[in-house]
């Protein structure tokens, strides 16, 4: 229901703008939520939405982002599955299939058809929570690429589980021992539990490239070669 509410707000700029307007009293914004969503949604959902719109938001887009985050967190809390890993695997499937990425990212495509396609691809291969999150997000990209949507969802899920996400790019898969050592090192460095997601990219040649949020640690051979070429050219 939270995903549905976010979609409805995204489709109605006048409504989302009014709900994000800090000049309007919080009680007024809360009443709008009750009037619009109260008749069709569960009291718990309406309560979460009411609380959300009473906060200060810089824009309607930020409000919708906030409601989407609530939806992802709610799906995560309700599931015992490894939603984070399942979303990551789906993001790699999208990255490896340009036609799929184009179909899901097309502005001309029908939103519900995109959701149905994702549900069809994931049902039986992933948990209900993952199907819900992925199929819901692709229906309202709001100028974001599919992989951006999934990456953000992965970070939210990891945060809800008390972890940070490290995306490791390597020329070959890490052994269990290497992954364990890297996880331990990163956990100590960042002071939090780390979840590793590995991307295989032969172009890095050797070494690793690690990204945690906006922080990038590039220890790849390709990066060192690029630095060397730049120095030689200079």
Where are these regions (language model features)?
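Elongated, mostly alpha-helical coiled-coil "stalk/stator" tethers of large membrane protein machines
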Residues: 1-211, 215-234
